[in-house]
Amino acid sequence: GHVPCGKDGRKCGYHADCCNCCLSGICKPSTSWTGCSTSTFLLTR
């Protein structure tokens, strides 16, 4: 399933769609959050 993005409420299948995916698999709006990285591609589809 898709994961809702806290930044704007849109949903993303890949982190690049609208947010960054953390190692936990939860989407966060900024890489400044602990554990977040734009280089971490976690598929949520």
Curated annotation (Swiss-Prot):
GO terms for molecular function: sodium channel regulator activity; toxin activity. It comes from the Eukaryota. InterPro entries: Conotoxin-I_CS, Toxin_19. It is found in: Secreted. Expressed by the venom duct. The modification D-leucine is found at residue 43. It holds the Pfam family Toxin_19. Disulfide bonds join 5-19, 12-22, 18-27, 21-36. GO terms for cellular component: extracellular region. Keywords: D-amino acid, Disulfide bond, Ion channel impairing toxin, Neurotoxin, Secreted, Toxin, Voltage-gated sodium channel impairing toxin. Residues 45 form a propeptide. The cysteine framework is XI (C-C-CC-CC-C-C). Iota-conotoxins bind to voltage-gated sodium channels (Nav) and act as agonists by shifting the voltage-dependence of activation to more hyperpolarized levels. Produces general excitatory symptoms. Belongs to the conotoxin I1 superfamily. This is Iota-conotoxin-like R11.13. It comes from Conus radiatus (Rayed cone).
